[in-house]
Structures are given as C-alpha cells and as structure tokens.
UniProtKB/Swiss-Prot annotation:
Gene3D superfamilies: 3.10.20.590, HUPs (3.40.50.620), Isoleucyl-tRNA Synthetase, Domain 1 (1.10.730.10). GO terms for molecular function: aminoacyl-tRNA deacylase activity; ATP binding; leucine-tRNA ligase activity. Pfam families: Anticodon_1, tRNA-synt_1, tRNA-synt_1_2, tRNA-synt_1g. A motif ('HIGH' region) lies at residues 39-50. NCBIfam families: leuS_bact (TIGR00396). GO terms for cellular component: cytosol. It catalyses: tRNA(Leu) + L-leucine + ATP = L-leucyl-tRNA(Leu) + AMP + diphosphate. Keywords: Aminoacyl-tRNA synthetase, ATP-binding, Cytoplasm, Ligase, Nucleotide-binding, Protein biosynthesis. It is an enzyme of class 6 (ligase). This is Leucine--tRNA ligase. Its EC number is 6.1.1.4. ATP binds at K576.
Length: 804
C-alpha cells in the first residue's frame, strides 16, 4: 500500500540533501528562467490558492530540466511592509522576528509540497545584504534626476500613520486594511516614472503578456494627444492653461473648470463667492482621486465669480471649481464643451450653463454628441470633420501664440515615501545649510536600526525620527545634518528581486553582468493579475532605468507573463473573515502533496477562477493509487515492478503512448495542465485493458507524470531500479509514425446483412481483405453451399459479398 506520509518526506529530504534542483551551469545548455511572484510572508501561512501558480511553474521547471535546459527556479520573500508592522504594533513584537518566523513557516509549507526550488538562492528584501542594492539603485536614480523631493498632495492614512500611493487607494480607503484616506500636502520623495511613460507604453507591444494586463497598463499610463491652450482671466494679468484632446471644439466652450487645489483659485475668487468656494474646498478633502473622477457620481461644483476669455472668439466664460478636475492631471484646469462631452453635459445641465453645438450629428437637447461630424458655428473650422479640424485648430493656436500641440499622461510620478519604520531607509542626509547628499556608496547598506518603539508619529515623520542617535549626523567639518526618516514603500524590494536571484551572494555588485546576460529576461513569470499597475509597472520602470545605466542587458524583465486564476470556496474569495480558507497542510496530511498538486492542476484552466471541491483531492488520490498499483507490486516488504511490466512490445499501446507523450509535452508548454493530466488518465485506462506494458512506456509515463506528482514518481522510478533522480532522466519523445493505427477493423456483409468484423493491416490489398473476410467462421456458415458471385471491397472499411 502506498504511504504518502513516508514517501513524500523521504524524497523531500533526499532532494534537499543532494541539492537535486541546484541551478544548472553547463555552458552548452540553453537557459530557462521560470519565476513565481515571491510571496509576502504573512502570519497566516499559505492557503490552497498559493500552490496553484507555484505548481504550474514547478511543472515547467522540472520538464525543462529533463529537456536539457539549465533551469533557474528560485524562491524568496517580499518581507518589508505594513502588515508585519501593524502586527508588531498590536502585539509589541519585533517585526523582524515576526517576519523571520513567518518565513520559516512558509518555507516548511513550500518544502512539504515538493517544489523544486534552488534554496541556495533564497533571498529576502529585509536582509541588509539585499537592501544594500535597493538603496544603491535609489542612489543611481537620484544621480540621474529621477528621484526628487516635492511638496505634493498625498493620500494620507491617519490610521496607518503613512502615505499610500494612488494605486493603493480603492474607493477612498487603503487597499490593505480598508482604512480611510485623506488628501493633504506633504514633503515626499518622488520617482520620475513619467520620464519613462512612452517607453513603458510602446514596449508593451513586444511582450507575451495577457492582453487585459497590457490594456490596464496602457490605461494607467493614459497617453493622450491634444493641445494646450492659454485662457486669460478677465480684468486681470492672470492666466491659466488647459489641456484638451478636442481643440476642434473650442468654439463650443461655455465655461471652464479649475481643480479646487489650483493656486489660482484663491487669487481670482470674488468676495461674494469666497465663502461658498472655501466651504466646497473643505468638503472634498477626504476624497481620493478615483472617487473624484468617477463618471457615475453626482456632479458638484461652485462658481468662483471670475471669468476667462476664450482665445478663439474673445467670449467671456465663467470659471468654476469642481472635484472632478485634479490638480495633478494635465494643468489642473479644463475647458467645458457640454454639447460634445458627457461629463460637461451633466454638469451644465445641473448648473444651468449654456450648451452650444459646434459639431453636427446628435440631438443636444437630449444628450452630448461625442462622435465625428461636420463642424458648425466654428468660424474657420466650419465644414471640416473632427481630425482635419483638430489639426487646423492646433496650427491656428500655434500661429497666434495662444496654444500648441501637447501629449499628456494620466500616470503621475511615483510617491516613494512612507512614514513607517519597517521599510528600507532612504540613504539621504539633509544638512543644516540646506544641502542634501547621498550616503556614500561604500557606506551602504544604511541599516534599519533595531527599535522597540515603532509607533507611527502621526506626523509627516516616520518613527525613525524619534531615534536621535541614528538621525543626527556630523560631517568631518562639524556640519550638522539629519538622516532622511521616511522609508521606502514595499514595492521597492520587489522591483528588482528577479535580478538578485541570478547572483544572490555577490557583495561587489547587484549581480555579475555576465550572469545577467546569460539569464535575462525571465522566460516565464506566473502570478496574480492584481499587480497589473503596481509591481509589474514599477518593475518594468526600474528595469529600464538599470538598462539605461548599462547594468542589465534587456529592455524588459519578463518576456512571458501568465496570470493564474483564483481558487474560490463556495464561489467566494478565500479569506479568514469569511471563514472559508482551506489550509494546504490539512490536504497534504490527508491525501498527500502529489494529490494536492495534481488536483489543483486538474481543476480547470490555470487562468480561470474555480471553486474548490473538498472531494477533489480524494478523487485524484484514487487515480494516483491506481498508477501505483499498475506499475508496482508491493505485496512483499520490498516493492518490485508489477508483473505487467515487460521488456517486449506487442504494439498494443504504441498509438496511445506516443499520443500521450505528444499531447502532454505540447500542453505543458502551453500551460494547459488540466488537459495534459486528462491525457495521462486516458493512457492509464489503456494500460488497464492490456496484459502487458512495455517497460519503455511505463518509464516514459513516469517521466511525464513526475513534474505533477514528483514524490510518487521518484519512488516508482526507484522501484524500477534507477539510482538517480527521475529529474535527471531525459524527457520522453514520440515516434510520429506510431501516431496512426497500424491496423484497421473492417466489417463483412453477406447479401447485404452484416455477418462480422475482422482486424487487418491498414491499407491491405483487396485480395488480402477478401481472404480474411471469407475465412471468418461466421461468414463461412452463410456461404456454405453457395457460389460467390461478386465481392466489393471498400479499403479499410468493408467487404461486401454477394452469393447465391
């Protein structure tokens, strides 16, 4: 009887002790770098959702090794971040100790699932030897002018005591923990990701990534081409610029809108409107950008009492403020053409502002018309369609010096400051004379000091500000300075970790340039779709910076990306609060790691979200037990190969075996693991129907199944008399000539009635088919005493006999 508890521990110990999965370095072999999104080691440990992606990459790693590749398949820990700090605050524990305990637990769970990681390359972002290089990258960005300080409106979370990035705010609350977020201005470190906007956008075209992820990044970057136009304030020397993608509709502008935070608002508001304007500005303080720009929300706004002059026709148009205009997007001001823009139309209708048609084609008494049409009421644009009119208007604006063509981006620079303790220290010193300098490279890493009081200060300073011994510094000339007390966000360490796996113990460089050339880019990267505009965008940005520095040899880090779906329970996402989390440890204990791995790959397509079935692993275990019984006789103490295994081949399994090798190999390559496993089940069914199984086919099947259920397959391989791990056995190949049947079944009719079937070599001659048909005992009966008048043979199908 197969005992998974004994066998799985035995092989896990063997793999670890023998370093079976050490990264290959044979210069003659091609490389394959297969990567999981490394996990945040939370206190909860793994749930059954984690192993789905990990099993998929593990199958690929194991197959590629067997196919003769040097495989890099590493694992590490994204260990900085708010959850550990929140836990530490609530319990009084040290986040470092808590994190290391969690890592040990996670690692034990991963090893119990038999993943073929090269543990010699394990990294964690909280290791000073690792974040030395995170700090080094920051310093290079600073020198390139890509890291700068600015007073910016930020998403401040008082509960967390820190700022969170735009990407981390959902419906006015923090992505993690759901705490309320308020807008306020603070001094922040920013990374100039906008300098790379065009490259981040254009290079998406060359990547083998899911289209929805590419589309999310395109929308996030949000490149739009239009014009920037200057509007003067009536009776004033003040003016403001607006960006518009529809300069052709300027003749239809009936009002303008400024962001409430726009500096100009205070200067131009009339005394009569001041109270209303101030009250409105206060009312929107806690709204996030996403809430403010939601198309479905009710429009709000206030008139400033000021008027602007439309440069194309000299008309006076009222200046309003509204929260849907963001100070950080474009110029923080927009023109409103309600006849041809849905949002402007809703606003104008609500506040009874004029609606002027300048493009024919709709009914503006009912709704805005945003389509193409002939321009009217537009002076020199009359009679033109949209694109021609845009070009002509841009030329006119440029000629008159009141505007120009402009490309705009929705993406903002990346807010890189966090007012927390548990993050990488930013290696910067602010001196009393106003100078800011970097910590010298030879002094990196700037270590995070050990500290028990890590309570957020509730101010723009992090808890590090309380550590005066650490913060205060004096240079050799007696000049006093203070260290930067903000720390980096959790996204910093994960923006380059895939490079460190290539050379994890290098203390002279982030990684050896020759090794980077050998291994980059990552060939396959599997992880969740929820990181589309965070980690995946940030990592691409950092990689491009490192490419410009000559540190990395490729423009992009991840050639192929694949998103695994969610594993649901009762059609809901698993979470502790819902009480529907399935712990993999329990499944492994009862059914074995091989059963869990095989079930998760067999559930359905890898990229689909699928409901967990509690009976699933037991069903898969029955299949695996059948594999064991088919190949192994374990009636005595020492298991031996089953009596069915033979060195002879009678050809009965030729077609199904070669089909199985072909299908499994192709479907693994395409990440269609569920259909590959189905094919292996079909082969096992065929094995039940024959008396003998050729050893070559039994061993070939074990090699195919080993990436999915590695423990049992190692054991069977060992029973078959092999000393080395099945991982070192060459991947099976198929014989194309055996994919077609060598024999066919033909039917026989006598005088129009079916009288039997017979097997014969495919494409046998008419004479051979007739001889075989007339030799059948049942046919002989019906021909007795009769004369055969005619025989019609349809090759490979039927023999028709006419007899009298």
């Amino acid at each position: 009887m197969y005992n998974h508890k004994v066998v799985e521990k035995k092989w896990q110990k063997y793999w670890l002790e023998n370093k079976t999965f050490k990264t290959g370095t044979d210069p003659e072999k091609p490389k394959y770098y297969v990567l999981d999104m490394f996990p945040y080691p939370s206190g909860k440990g793994l749930h059954v959702g984690h192993p789905e992606g990990y099993t998929a990459t593990d199958i690929m790693a194991r197959m590629k090794r067997a196919q003769g590749y040097n495989v890099l398949h590493p694992m590490g820990w994204d260990a900085f971040g708010l959850p550990a700090e929140q836990y530490a605050l609530q319990t009084g524990n040290d986040p470092a100790t808590f994190t290391d305990e969690n890592i040990a637990h996670f690692k034990k769970q991963l090893q119990a699932l038999g993943f073929s990681y090269d543990w010699d390359r394990e990294i964690k972002t909280t290791d000073p030897n690792y974040y030395k290089w995170t700090q080094w990258i920051f310093e290079q960005m600073y020198k390139m002018g890509l890291a700068y300080e600015a007073e910016v409106p930020v998403n401040w979370s008082p509960d967390l005591g820190t700022v969170v990035a735009n990407e981390e705010v959902i419906d006015g609350k923090t992505e993690r923990g759901g705490y309320p977020v308020y807008r306020r201005k603070m001094r922040q470190w920013m990374l100039k990701i906008t300098a790379y906007a065009d490259r981040l956008l254009d290079d998406l075209d060359d990547l083998d990534w899911p289209e929805p992820i590419k589309e999310m990044q395109r929308n996030w970057i949000g490149r739009s081409v239009g014009a920037q136009v200057t509007f003067k304030i009536k009776d004033s020397d003040k003016s403001f610029a607006v960006f518009t993608t529809r300069p052709d509709t300027l003749f239809g502008c009936s009002y303008t809108v400024l962001a409430p935070e726009n500096e100009l608002v205070k200067e131009i508001t009339s005394p009569e409107q001041k109270e209303a304007v101030d009250a409105y500005i206060k009312s929107i303080e806690s709204k996030s950008d996403l809430e403010r720009t939601d198309l479905n929300k009710d429009k709000t706004g206030v008139f400033t009492g000021a008027y602007a002059i439309n440069p194309v026709n000299g008309e006076e148009v009222p200046v309003w403020i509204s929260d849907y205009v963001l100070a950080t997007y474009g110029t923080g001001a927009v023109i409103a053409v309600p006849a041809h823009d849905e949002r402007d139309y809703a606003f104008a209708t609500k506040f009874d502002l004029p609606i002027k048609e300048v493009v024919e084609g709709g009914d503006i008494s009912k709704e805005a018309f945003a389509g193409d049409g002939v321009h009217v009421n537009s002076d020199f644009l009359n009679g033109l369609h949209n694109e021609e009119a845009k070009a002509k208007m841009v030329d006119w604006l440029t000629e008159k010096g009141v505007g120009e063509k402009k490309v705009n981006y929705k993406m903002r620079d990346w807010n890189f400051s966090r007012q927390r303790y548990w993050g990488e220290p930013i290696p910067v010193i602010h001196w009393e004379d106003g100078e800011t300098t970097l910590v010298p490279e030879d002094e990196l890493p700037l270590r995070l000091p050990k500290e028990s009081n890590i309570k957020p200060s509730g101010t723009p300073e992090s808890p590090l500000a309380n550590l005066t011994d650490w913060v205060n510094v004096v240079d050799e000339n007696g000049r006093k300075g203070k260290r930067e007390t903000n720390t980096m966000p959790q996204w910093a360490g994960s923006s380059w970790y895939f490079l460190r796996y290539i050379d994890p113990h290098n203390d002279k460089a982030l990684a050896d340039p020759e090794l980077l050339k050998k291994w980059m880019p990552v060939d396959l990267y599997i992880g969740g779709a929820e990181h589309a505009t965070l980690h995946l965008l940030y990592a691409r940005f950092w990689h491009k910076v490192l490419y410009d520095l000559g540190v990395v040899p490729t423009k992009e880090p991840f050639q192929k990306l694949y998103n695994q779906g969610l594993i649901l329970k009762n059609h809901e996402k698993m979470s502790k609060s819902r009480g529907n989390v399935v712990n993999p440890d329990d499944v492994v204990d009862e059914y074995g790691a091989d059963s869990l791995r095989t079930y998760e790959m067999f559930m359905g397509p890898l990229n689909a979200s699928i409901d967990w079935d509690d009976n699933g692993p037991s069903g898969v275990k029955k299949f695996l037990d059948r594999v064991w019984r088919t190949f192994v006789n374990d009636l005595d103490l020492d298991p031996i190969p089953s009596e069915k295994i033979t060195d002879k081949n009678d050809g009965k399994l030729d077609k199904i075996y070669n089909e199985t090798v072909k299908t499994v190999t192709e479907h693994f390559e395409e990440l269609r693991f569920n259909t590959a496993i189905s094919q292996m089940m079909v082969f096992m069914n065929a094995c039940q129907k024959v008396d003998k199984i050729p050893r070559e086919y039994a061993e070939g099947f074990v090699k195919l199944m080993a990436p999915v259920a590695p423990h049992m397959m190692e054991e069977i391989w060992h029973v078959f008399g092999h000393d080395e791990s099945v991982q070192f056995a060459a991947w099976p190949t198929y014989d194309a000539s055996k994919l077609v049947e060598s024999t066919v079944e033909m039917a026989v009719t006598v005088n129009g009635k079916k009288r039997g079937n017979f097997q014969i070599a495919k494409d046998a001659s008419r004479e051979e088919a007739q001889a075989a048909a007339t030799a059948l005992p049942h046919v002989k009966e019906f021909l007795e005493g009769k004369e055969i008048k005619k025989v019609i043979v349809v090759p490979n199908k039927i023999v028709n006999i006419v007899a009298k």
